[in-house]
Amino acid sequence: MIKFFYIIFTLLYVSLAYDKSPLKAGKSLIWDSENQSYTANGDVEFKNDKFTAYADKMIAKYIEKQNKEIFTTVELFENVKIEFEEEVFRGNHAIYTRDDNIIKLTGDVSIESPTRLLTGYELIADIDNNKRILNSANDESLVEVLLDNNAKN
């Protein structure tokens, strides 16, 4: 009986907090408190103070700090789309690490901005330093793109 009330309370709490949550899922959202992680499936959305990410599946690891969950690593799978300021990053797989504030995308990667579209195999986006490294289809060919915050073109 206690388990029943615990499940009802948990579902009520999750439904009330869902709108304010940085993490949303269309099909399932599994919380693993022991391993401090979430697994989300179906129309996944993740938001933080830097970007918004969408994918078919996501695994997010977190730490608890002052009674809040701080997401440290977010891994996105299939149909990945990341909106950052005026840029949109797309790929098949992405991993974000909070410690260095870097997003790494792989597989049919693109960077789209109001003035350009770049494509390649791998993208490393350094959010703090406003730097993008795009690896083309050839593993040995690298293209580095520096974006100026005040650039008009």
What are these regions (language model features)?
Residues 1-153:
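Mature-chain termini and adjacent capping regions
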